[in-house]
Structure formats: C-alpha cells, structure tokens
C-alpha cells in the first residue's frame, strides 16, 4: 500500500514576520509541514523558528530538514525536541543528518571529519535520541557519547512517537536511514561539502534507483512501511517544460532529459506536475515532496489535487 502524498514548504531565508505568515499560509493551502534547514546562513535557527511556526498554526507539522548531528550533543538535543513536540501538541517530525556544509564547520570551528566518522557519530546519536524520546532509559557507552539515564519532563506527546527522518545521498547514510528512520530523505550526494555539478549529476533517475537499493538494504522487511521524501531544487509551474529544463540543466551539469527525469526537479503545467509526482510514487515510492516558499502558491493546485491520496 503506497504512502499518501503530502507536501512541505521550507521557511529558510525568511525573517520572523514572514516566517510565521508563510507558515499560516502554508496551512491554509493544505501543506502538511513547514521545514527549516540547519545552516549558519541568513535564516532563523531551526528549532526556534519551527517553534514560532508551530505556535502560529494549529494543524501544521514542523520538521527541521535536517539538523546536523555534529552541532549538538544528543541528550540536550533530545530535550529540545521533546519540548517542541509538547509545545506543538504533537506536531514535530525530527530530521537528522551527518552534516555537510563546509562553511558551517569552518565558521563554527567544528572539526569537519570524514563522512564515515560523521555517519558513525550520527548512528550513535540516533541510538541515544530514539529511546529518550520514547521516555525510555538509556545506557550508552560508545565511541563518541556516554549517556546514562532518562529524559525529564516534558516528554513528547505525539501518539505513536515522534517520527524520525534521516536524509542523505550516499550508501552508508541511506543504509543507516533504511535501518533506523520512519522517513527517508533521498538527497543528491554532498560529500564535497558544497553544492556543485557533482551534486546535480548525483540527482538523476539512475542515481535515484541506486539510492533506493541502499535504503532497501538497510530496511529489509520494513521497507514498505517507510515514507520517502524528496527536496525539489527546481520547482516551476510552466507550459514550457522542455525550454525551462534546457536552460537550467547545464547549471546542474546534466542534460535536459536527465533534469526532467530527476525527482529533485519538477517543471510543467499543473496537470503535468501531478502526473510526474504520481510517477515518482509508482517508480520509487516517493510520496513526501518538499519545496521552497516562493513556489508554495503556484503549486497549491498540485497540493490540493494530491494531498492525502
């Protein structure tokens, strides 16, 4: 049974007034969720910004997309997450990743370790955070963290627990995500620490097929219960689908045909975009679509047609 479609809007780059107004408008338009990335750029800090969005709305879910594990100790992070779930009356989704943006690490003076080390550290964080958010005792003596105890109140209030999202684009990360997460973010690989042509070339249909195989390797029998998410880096309602793709594809280091086949680009009329998203679910199981705030209004008819189906 496929997962129902839902859609999220990124609040990245918005000031405080625009952030809450955009969250309220997203809720009115039928979007499931608002998100914030986790970077030292011109944007609200993710957990504070999402708390504001949650308190300004009534049904909208909130998702940090995604928190870089290296920036926070897992027990303190679990405390923040539990509080946000309680304040939002159970509307939190937790997105975690291994961290990637070189400039963040350099600015903060945090060691930008190898991808393998960062993923091992993330795996330990997950093994600490998941039971803490369930109200369970943790006894963990690992390579990176030593934790003993239970999380004090407030605990999460969400029925069934707080959904965990892990996102990435390479084998170790997606295998871990398949084994541990409820929601899997299928991303272009960003091991270079920057978004460049290599990321575009890792966003094609062929690469997505490989990534789904890695998720399946980690998930085993639980794969069919997972929710798969994609982030749209190009989203445009247009009657000139091929022309837009031909113009944008060279910036990504791929062909127009590859751009139109990627689950990270969506260009076309409303009807074409609806058909394309349905095709992604049929082909890959992707049902959770994330886009930027500037595309929110244009894609509202797509959201209205597909949400919950």
Question: What does each model-identified segment do?
Answer:
Residues 1-309:
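Active-site-adjacent structural elements that line small-molecule/cofactor binding pockets in enzymes
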């Amino acid at each position: 049974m496929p997962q129902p479609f839902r859609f999220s809007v990124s609040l990245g780059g918005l000031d405080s007034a625009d952030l809450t107004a955009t969250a309220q408008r997203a809720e009115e338009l039928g979007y499931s969720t608002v998100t914030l990335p986790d970077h030292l750029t011109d944007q609200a800090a993710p957990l504070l910004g999402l708390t504001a969005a949650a308190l300004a709305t009534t049904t909208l879910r909130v998702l940090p997309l995604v928190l870089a594990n290296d920036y926070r100790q897992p027990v303190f992070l679990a405390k923040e997450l539990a509080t946000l779930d309680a304040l939002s009356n159970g509307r939190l989704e937790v997105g975690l990743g291994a961290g990637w943006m070189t400039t963040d690490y350099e600015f903060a003076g945090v060691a930008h370790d190898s991808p393998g080390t960062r993923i091992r550290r993330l795996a330990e964080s997950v093994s600490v955070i998941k039971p803490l958010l369930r109200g369970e005792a943790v006894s963990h003596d690992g390579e990176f963290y030593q934790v003993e105890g239970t999380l004090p109140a407030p605990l999460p209030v969400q029925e069934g627990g707080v959904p965990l999202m892990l996102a990435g684009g390479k084998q170790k990360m997606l295998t871990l995500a398949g084994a541990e997460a409820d929601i899997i973010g299928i991303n272009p690989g960003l091991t270079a620490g920057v978004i460049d042509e290599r990321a575009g070339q890792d966003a094609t249909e062929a690469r997505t097929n490989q990534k789904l195989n890695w998720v399946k390797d980690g998930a085993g029998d639980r794969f069919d219960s997972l929710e798969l998410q994609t982030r749209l880096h190009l989203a445009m309602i247009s009657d000139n689908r091929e022309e837009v793709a031909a113009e944008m594809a060279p910036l990504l280091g791929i062909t127009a045909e590859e751009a139109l086949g990627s689950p990270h680009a969506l260009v076309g009329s409303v009807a074409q975009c609806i058909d394309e998203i349905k095709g992604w679910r049929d082909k890959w199981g992707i049902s959770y679509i994330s886009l930027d705030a500037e595309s929110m209004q244009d894609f509202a008819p797509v959201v209205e047609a597909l949400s919950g189906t």
